Amino acid sequence: MEEGILLKKYVESSDKDIRYMALSDLAARLNDANHLKNLKLESFPDTLDVLLQALSDASPEVQQEAVRCVAIISSKIPQDKLKSTVENLLSGVAGKKSKNYLSALSLLLSNSNVQPFVNKFYTSTVFPSFLQILKQYNVAQEEFFAILCVVCDSLEIYHSNLSTLLPNNFELCIDVFQKCTTQCQRELIIKKACYLLSDVSLYGPRFAYKYIIEVLDRGLGPSTQMSEVNISIKLLNEILLSSKKEKDSSTSFISTAVADYTNKILSLLKKEEAPDELTQKLLEVLGLLLEYQQVNILKIWPELHGLLISKISYDPNLISDTNDEDDIADFLEEMSDYSSIYEDEEDVSWIVRRESLKVVLSVILSRLEYLPIVLQALGTSVVSKLNDREESVCLISIEVLKQAFLHVPRWIEVYATSNDRKRRYEGLPSDRSAISDTSIYLVSVIGKHVSKLSDKTPLSIVSELLNLVTVIFSSRDLGVQSEFSNLSSIIYRFPDFSTLDIKIKLNLVRLISAIISCGCEEIENMESKMSTILSLAVQNNYPQLSYEALITELSFCKYIHKKQPTNVSTDFSTMIDSSLQLLESKISDLKVRLALIDLVSQYVILFYEPDFDSIFLRRVLIILCKKLQEEPTRSAAARALCDIFMSVTDITKIENGTKIYEEILQDCCRHIDKSGNEFTTAYLELLEVLLKVGQKYLAESLLEHILGLLIETLKRNTENTVAILKCLLIIPLSILLKSKNLLIDTIISHLQSSTIHLNEESVCLLSRIIAVISKEEDLELIINSFTCAQKPVEEMVTLALIAAQLICIFQSKAIVTSLNKSFMSPKSEVRIKVFTTLIFGQLDYGKLTLPANEYFDTIASNLNSPNADVMKAAAIALGSLTSQSEKFIKELCALYVSDAYDKELLLISFLTFLKKSKIDYETADKIWDILSKDIENIKDFSTSPFRTLLSECLGLLICNESSSLYYKLELLSSSEASNHMLLSLSVFRFSLTLDCPKLKAYEKQFFEKAYKLFQNPDLEVSQETLQVIISVIKNRRSCIADVYNELLQGLISKSSVDSSNVHVVQMGPFQHVVDNSINQRQLVFETLYSLLDIPESLNHLTHFLQVSVMGLEDEHYIKLVSLSILEKLVDCSPSIIDEQVDTILEALRKIIELRKTEKTLKTDSDNILDLVRSALRVLFTMKLKCDNPVISEFESQVQKGPYSLEYEGIKNEIKTTIKT
């Protein structure tokens, strides 16, 4: 092999160039991905030894190539040799042979393929060795810093196992820390040493952080030297930064002392002798404490407030009284060229000012409740820094103000809309004026500042001010009207739009959008400038800028139309014209094309008048006609033309209007049934409008062609029934009658189709069109044809409704009489009896002047029919008829109480009635009491269809009457009777599928009590509760937040086999083990699977992983759900899978090794295949997401096994899904 030849060439050559070329070629060959994949180091046993020797080659160039080779093959080093390889590299670093040993070691440790294996011995071998090496080196040597960097980088990867660190190794860590902080003044080394100690303290054993507390307590003491304070602050800073990155890491030892540390830092900040660099660090730590630890800000506010004011204004080189609120605006106006006062390159006081402002920002971002206090106390100080002589201070002051104004609406929403006694007790404001008045004042000062900006103001500051002004205009609570002119003047600071950076262009467009949204009268004065900017932005090559500019232009159109609907300025017209020109060109971005179509069509609709520019309108129609033929824009163009023709009803006023109209109509007809469903809908909607507008201009032959086209479309297309029928109803009756028989046959065939599902609108349209083209004598034949439909009773209801509407339209009592004879005849077929019963339930007896009560009794008598379909039809018809009269409600209740008929059938009647009717509280209350009476005595209630029907009826009653009946549901759930609890849960579950906005608060309240029932010893109650929880996760996710932790722990406790529910049953000579809780456990796993969709679950993935691995040892269905959970976990967090990769792969191996035999039953065979396919899905998902050699090795075994074909199929499925 070529690798062996190259290694031999290196070993045997004394020429450094040949050795270099040999290793260079070897590195190039190894770097080939396909070659590396199949490389096995066992074929070249001396490879590693040779490469490790090459790291100390006499030639530096050869050493570097050796480092490359070691880094590339590190993922191929066998596990049994990996530890010795790392130890050899550590020996090379310790022996000071070459710095390339360290480079090679660093690259190996950072290789994700070897990390799972190194993780096993990092804490016991690698980390202590590093510490010993650091003790040997002099801190002044450059190698010391290089090794320290590698140690810190590796800790970031391998800190998860530091909990096993031995005490003597921690002492080494302390020695290194002390060596760095006492023998060295180099800032970077001290910072790395602090990171080293903080990481070990956060992730190491308990004794580790005791030392760090001692260091902090000693360093932050009142009489400590500044050098020790400096070290302690840097150490505390690193700990807080680590806790910010790793939210799950243990920082309890900081949290317990947070108040003490905060007070100590405030005391240190008061010391005037503290240098600016230390003050900067103290402020950084203070900001982190306030933002990420629960500091009680109210307790320290008087001290903190005064300190921040002094530090924000801290400038020893300038004496100025700018803290007076009355003088702040004058100060900003006078100091418009503040930076030119003096230049002092050694002055770093600006860092203190900047860090002080960052502390304010930390409070605003993390502690919303304190926003009014912060603005009132510190707002003027922050605003005063808008003209600071240091650019970075100006920028951070702008950011503070921007974030404060962004949070004002949120504060008002959360705190100013409720009467919060607790806030008043704590001394926190809850009145809207507490924040509004201060904000309005600050906005007025900012407005004056913006209006006085100098030409010398840096572009970066003007750009950020632009963003600040955008935020101000976007808010409705900051009083922008009084400062409109001053604030909006910032637009004129950018005279040449074409030369601006793309980010500033975007921000300008967003500012214009915000200005338009505020709706001030003064906008008219800026119309010219804003039109010019938007026009230039639309023409830009950057799609996002063009798109946002177009959306803003559309808002501008609506604003102009609202203010001056008949008077459009020249600049505004030019802006629209340039957008139309862009639409004519071949612009590639689809989003921009769609926005352009929407803009030009809305412009026509908004400003169309009899004297509207007909040439412009003609151009718009021609362009849209072209877009109608381009596939990506067909639907949008069709809808735009719809809207335009609904406004422009007289096409003769358009130049060549009739010709353009005919072209659009022909194009519409050409594509109406050849495109996808979305486009068909759009074309049909356009055809409807075109027929309304220009029917009188169309030849009879063309109308006949359109009719034929619509009939053919109706035959094939069951998705667009409504749109097709609307078009048919516009065609003149004389044309329709020519194809009467064909049309009726098509409609009947359409109705008899098993795939057709009609809504209320389509039923009305069908009734109308049949009535338009038919005569009364045709009616009986048409209705009889409906009975031939092979549909279940529930679907025949729709056909019966059409028949009933036709009877009412023609006022045909004769048909009713004929149907009644068929109904009463004992010789009538069942299907005729079913259909007639359903018709009687839907007739409008008032219109027909027929006695409805007679038909009520006739229908009710069929509830005892020997045929099940007739009984069901009678139940549905009775419910429909009940919705016509309050008298029938009482009669239906009486029938239910009488026990003369099957209660399940009568529940179907109630269900039908409640879906159609709105009833008052008294009636709802009465029905509830009747339906829910004596349910505790019903046997097999949990599995009975009766429970489902009853739950739906009661659920509809609750949603019908909103909250009034919720107390009865709560009474049921608090009952000790199992049937009561089951009913309350199933009613609640059904109500979750309905949209009842008024019930949201009651739903949350009920759920927080009811969800605990999944711990109920009654397994049926527990299972129904789990079904409820799954439904809540899907439909009312917000209800989960407050109960998440308790729910998760409860589910985990129920996920394992409960021995108290397992018993042995003797069946003949055999004994069978029965697990009564298996259904409950299945639902627990389903609930956990659904719960993974809640964002909070990302903080508890370890629990899900443990449960899913345990579930792989359970019964078949639970194994399947566990595999689905695992697949989700791989998507959520591949790193957590890496931690348990061996356990997971072992569980997958057991499943994939399952085999079918000749004696295996088909059911068992299918179950095995389902399991194996699910396991293979998890494996391939792991391969995609986790970069781990163990997974690759396992995959190669699967590809050689009996399920290799299934695995390839699953790979293709997943890849196709990802592409889609």
From Swiss-Prot:
Pfam families xref list: TIP120
Cellular component GO terms, alphabetical: cullin-RING ubiquitin ligase complex; nucleus
UniProt keyword annotations, A-Z: Nucleus, Repeat, Ubl conjugation pathway
Single Gene Ontology BP annotation: protein neddylation
Compartment(s) of residence: Nucleus
Highest taxon, organism lineage: Eukaryota
HEAT-type repeats, residues: 1-35, 42-79, 121-157, 259-295, 365-410, 615-650, 680-700, 701-737, 738-775, 810-847, 850-887, 1020-1057
Its biological purpose: Key assembly factor of SCF (SKP1-CUL1-F-box protein) E3 ubiquitin ligase complexes that promotes the exchange of the substrate-recognition F-box subunit in SCF complexes, thereby playing a key role in the cellular repertoire of SCF complexes. Acts as a F-box protein exchange factor.
Entry's family note: Belongs to the CAND family.
Full protein name: Cullin-associated NEDD8-dissociated protein 1
Source organism of the structure: Schizosaccharomyces pombe (strain 972 / ATCC 24843) (Fission yeast)
This protein's encoding gene: knd1
